């Protein structure tokens, strides 16, 4: 029993040593058969590592050269190129002028820093001349005068003339006024003109007018006037042809009128002739004053808008007493002879030319618009507080002149404000 313990220990020691020697032999044999397989990556050839590309570096080699050049700061805001206007060189004085240039009154200053040679914007030079000055530096006034023409000056004082031709259709019972031409003076240039014709008989009167034409020395209308008239009323009827003008403020005035009898003796039918127009005495130059207003109609809302803007040259017997008092305008909406509604503007101080700038709105169906009208009455307040009329006017198809044309323009142009001046009547 005592002998067996040392034997066991000796066997274990020999077995361990044999195992270690066998392991070392196997390791040496593996290294001999595969000499490079067991090397770590860091033990491999460093040249091979340089030849292999990696994810972090590229196999190509770059050459970086460093140079020092001045860097110019770039402005955040770039201003566009500004060019001066090119003068129209047409005068012979300018064409024959040998030396002219744009001179600056400021002395040139030295640049703070040298500019780069490629900066064309900073080195750009202005080559266009903005102004052309004479050699002596004095600009002379140029005055263009027209040669005096006695014949042309005499035509300014001549009365306007109207060319016309009368025809009558017995089957239709209509009177035709054709070949309308007007010869007027040129001192009222810039206005429009039209011809208005009216026939008065025992039963009443009918009117018709042409379209607006630019007023010239010789104005011609391609259209004519058609006036209904019974044949038995020809001997007693009177035809009035009126030449009217309209300025840019839509103010209508009478340039002249011509009265003709239709009995067939004074004016033969079918013959064209000239007639001298006479100034009408029906419309005074001042009257009771004028009022400026605009009207418009909104079909979708069935609303009639009347804007009272201002008045001027208000005249009446009590004008001096009412000067400085309150003045207002009463607007009445009528359908035929029935008054539908009336409204009044605010009061303004009577200074001959009062200003309101106030809008009045009426509810009016579309089917009642044709037979409706608007009446305006300018009212002044005296010392006792009583209101007195300074003038009135009416707009509608039942009226004539500018009052009728204003209403017709409103019907033709819905949703559009149309302003006109109208004469006030006492």
From Swiss-Prot:
Record bears the keyword Membrane: yes
Gene Ontology MF term list: calcium ion sensor activity; calcium-dependent phospholipid binding; SNARE binding
Tissue: Expressed in brain, pancreas and kidney.
S-S bonds: none
Main location class: membrane
UniProt-listed Pfam families: C2
Sequence intervals crossing the membrane: 7-29
Entry GO CC: axon; dense core granule; exocytic vesicle; intracellular membrane-bounded organelle; plasma membrane; synaptic vesicle membrane; transport vesicle
Gene Ontology terms describing biological process: calcium-dependent activation of synaptic vesicle fusion; regulation of calcium ion-dependent exocytosis; regulation of synaptic vesicle exocytosis; vesicle-mediated transport
Residue ranges annotated as Cytoplasmic topological domain: 30-426
CDD domains: C2A_Synaptotagmin-13, C2B_Synaptotagmin-13
PROSITE patterns attached to this UniProt entry: C2
Spans within the Vesicular topological domain: 1-6
Sorted UniProt keywords: Membrane, Repeat, Transmembrane, Transmembrane helix
Protein's membrane topology: Single-pass membrane protein
Record-stated family: Belongs to the synaptotagmin family.
Subunit architecture: Interacts with NRXN1.
PANTHER family, A to Z: SYNAPTOTAGMIN, SYNAPTOTAGMIN-13
Cited function: May be involved in transport vesicle docking to the plasma membrane.
UniProt comment concerning the protein's domains: The first C2 domain/C2A does not mediate Ca(2+)-dependent phospholipid binding. The second C2 domain/C2B domain binds phospholipids regardless of whether calcium is present.
Protein name: Synaptotagmin-13
Organism whose genome encodes this protein: Homo sapiens (Human)
Taxonomic classification: Eukaryota, Metazoa, Chordata, Craniata, Vertebrata
């Amino acid at each position: 029993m005592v002998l067996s313990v040392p034997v066991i220990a000796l066997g274990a020691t020999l077995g361990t040593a044999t195992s270690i020697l066998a392991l070392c032999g196997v390791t040496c044999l593996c290294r001999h058969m595969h000499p490079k397989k067991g090397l770590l990556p860091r033990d491999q050839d460093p040249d091979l590592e340089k030849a292999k590309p990696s994810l972090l570096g590229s196999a190509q080699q770059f050459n970086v050269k460093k140079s020092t050049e001045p860097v110019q700061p770039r402005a955040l805001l770039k201003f566009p190129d500004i060019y001066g206007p090119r003068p129209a060189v047409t005068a012979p004085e300018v064409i024959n002028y040998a030396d002219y240039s744009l001179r600056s009154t400021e002395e040139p200053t030295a640049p703070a820093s040298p500019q780069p040679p490629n900066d064309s914007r900073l080195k750009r030079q202005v080559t266009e001349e903005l102004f052309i000055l004479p050699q002596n530096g004095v600009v002379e006034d140029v005055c263009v005068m027209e040669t005096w023409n006695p014949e042309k000056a005499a035509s300014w004082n001549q009365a306007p003339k109207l060319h016309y031709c009368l025809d009558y259709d017995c089957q239709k019972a209509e009177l035709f006024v054709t070949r309308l031409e007007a010869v007027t003076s040129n001192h009222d240039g810039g206005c429009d003109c039209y011809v208005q014709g009216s026939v008065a008989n025992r039963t009443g009167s009918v009117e018709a007018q042409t379209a607006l034409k630019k007023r010239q020395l010789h104005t011609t209308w391609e259209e004519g006037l058609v006036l209904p008239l019974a044949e038995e009323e020809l001997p007693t009827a009177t035809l009035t042809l009126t030449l009217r003008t309209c300025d840019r403020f839509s103010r209508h005035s009478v340039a002249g009128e011509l009265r003709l009898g239709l009995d067939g003796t004074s004016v033969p039918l079918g013959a064209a002739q000239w007639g001298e127009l006479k100034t009408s005495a029906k419309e005074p130059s001042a009257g009771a004053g004028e009022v400026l207003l605009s009207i418009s109609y909104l079909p979708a809302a069935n609303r009639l808008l009347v804007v009272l803007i201002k008045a001027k040259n208000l005249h009446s017997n009590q004008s001096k007493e009412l000067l400085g008092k309150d003045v207002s305008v009463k607007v009445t909406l009528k359908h035929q002879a029935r008054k539908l509604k009336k409204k009044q503007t605010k009061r303004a101080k009577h200074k001959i030319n009062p200003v309101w700038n106030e809008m009045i709105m009426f509810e009016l169906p579309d089917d009642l618009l044709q037979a409706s009208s608007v009446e305006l009455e300018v009212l002044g307040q005296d010392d006792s507080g009583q209101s007195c009329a300074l003038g009135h006017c009416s707009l509608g198809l039942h009226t004539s002149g500018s009052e009728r044309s204003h209403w017709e323009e409103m019907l033709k142009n819905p949703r559009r404000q149309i302003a006109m001046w109208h004469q006030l009547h006492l």
